UniProtKB/Swiss-Prot annotation:
It comes from the Eukaryota. Residues 1-88 form a transit peptide. GO terms for cellular component: mitochondrial inner membrane. Keywords: Mitochondrion, Transit peptide. This is Altered inheritance of mitochondria protein 24, mitochondrial. Pfam families: AIM24 (PF01987). Signal peptide: none annotated. GO terms for biological process: inner mitochondrial membrane organization. Its main location: mitochondrion. InterPro entries: AIM24, AIM24_sf, Trp_RNA-bd_attenuator-like_dom. It is found in: Mitochondrion. It comes from Talaromyces marneffei (strain ATCC 18224 / CBS 334.59 / QM 7333) (Penicillium marneffei). Belongs to the AIM24 family.
Length: 405
């Protein structure tokens, strides 16, 4: 019995050893671990550190502290007679003398903010005694980032719903349109003054520090906020590699283009409506499928706050902006070239217009205007005349020779 069990144990041990050996040769041993909080990370071998945002920020009258990570809450400590503005419906709890707390609903520039798609309903909380409040958001995949403004550097908040709470008597927040940048102008807010800001982002929020002379390319849907510098961010597109296959051309498309039926059909309202629908579908595809090809280029010195979960391109770009970045409809470049060169139909000669009408009205248009002109010149150069029973060829001079003389 012992021998049998020993043989069985030996067989099982050898089978397990063989399986382990097979796994060692077939699979690579990879270890994935999260970076410690606050540790600097080198990006692609370039000395451009990416670090987590500070968990707390304090001023003389208030203090913001982020509790928990990544799905966190914001702890706000307010001194006496200090105002706290938080988005409506985000206040979780409050500690202190509740009888002294005054809460009012503030409507901040509803006309301008509604046009830009920025929330304008905020809750104003103040108390003559010190209090502590907890603020959170309804979305389960957001995290907080706190920013301390000392009056020397201004900030631009890119995402529409990124601003959650702020405090500071001299803090000024206004919606802005950056005319130099048409990609992320809608929903941006410029923050000036002194105070504390609480921003929220999808996923984790990280901070990127750029020194003078450094550049960074970021997707607009991942940028939460950035510091205002002398050089605003510019739209940027990576060079794409396309494979173009050359197929031997046929004369069928050229014959179809010469057909009068095809020309009349392309000039009809049905064709134009179908082309507009196709252009709208192409715009939607570029916004949803190829929208990741649109980037922003930042120049240092600057500080960027990026989120790990990007927003949709629809949230930061309008249809008009996508159409401007995408290719223009067919025919626009041709019309622009005609205006530039001044070649219009009115400038053409009577002979040119008559020749084009003759070629287009022919049942089988197998000749071009140039070919018809050459043919007419060849026929008009010589003529046969019968004189005294003999055939004589008399040559006539062309109009160009007469003009030269």
């Amino acid at each position: 019995m012992r021998l049998t069990l020993g043989k069985g144990a030996t067989v099982v041990y050898r089978a397990r050893a063989g399986a382990c050996a097979t796994r060692r040769h077939g699979v690579r041993n990879l270890r994935i671990k999260a970076a410690p909080l606050g540790e600097l990370t080198v990006v692609n071998g370039v000395n451009l550190p990416i670090s987590s945002t500070p968990s707390s920020a304090s001023s003389a009258d208030a203090k913001f502290h982020v509790v928990g990570t990544p799905y966190s809450m914001l702890s706000v400590s307010l001194s006496a007679s200090q105002n706290l503005y938080t988005r409506r419906g985000t206040l979780v709890g409050l500690s202190g003398k509740a009888d002294n707390v005054i809460s009012t609903l503030s409507v901040l520039e509803p006309l301008r903010r509604a046009v830009f798609g920025i929330p304008f309903l905020y809750q104003k909380i103040s108390s003559p005694s010190p209090i502590k409040a907890l603020v959170s958001v309804q979305s389960p995949v957001t995290s907080f980032a706190v920013v301390h403004l000392d009056g020397t550097v201004d900030w631009m908040i890119v995402q529409r719903r990124a601003l959650l709470a702020w405090t500071g008597h001299s803090l000024n927040i206004k919606p802005r349109i950056n005319r130099h940048l048409s990609v992320t102008n809608w929903g941006s807010s410029e923050v000036t003054g002194r105070g504390l800001l609480a921003l929220v982002g999808r996923g984790q929020v990280y901070s990127i520090e750029l020194k003078a002379g450094e550049q960074y390319i970021a997707h607009p849907s991942n940028v939460v906020a950035y510091t205002l510098a002398s050089m605003p961010p510019q739209p940027y597109r990576f060079k794409s590699t396309t494979l173009r296959f050359q197929i031997p051309g046929l004369d069928i498309p050229e014959l179809l283009l010469k057909s009068r039926y095809i020309r009349d059909f392309t000039a009809s309202d049905t064709w134009k409506a179908s082309m507009r629908i196709f252009h709208n579908v192409r715009t939607w595809a570029r916004r949803t499928i190829w929208g990741d090809r649109l980037f922003l280029r930042f120049e240092g010195p600057a500080t960027l706050l990026v989120q790990s979960r990007g927003a949709r391109v629809r949230d930061i770009m309008s249809d008009r902006e996508v159409n401007e970045i995408a290719d223009t409809p067919a025919g626009t470049t041709f019309n622009a070239i005609n205006k530039l060169t001044g070649v219009t139909k009115e400038d053409k000669s009577d002979y040119q217009r008559a020749a084009e009408e003759a070629v287009s009205q022919a049942p089988v248009p197998s000749r071009t205007v140039e070919g018809l002109t050459q043919e007419l010149k060849g026929v008009s150069q010589a003529i046969a005349i019968i004189r005294d029973g003999r055939v004589e060829f008399e040559t006539f001079k062309s109009q160009n020779d007469d003009a030269r003389k």
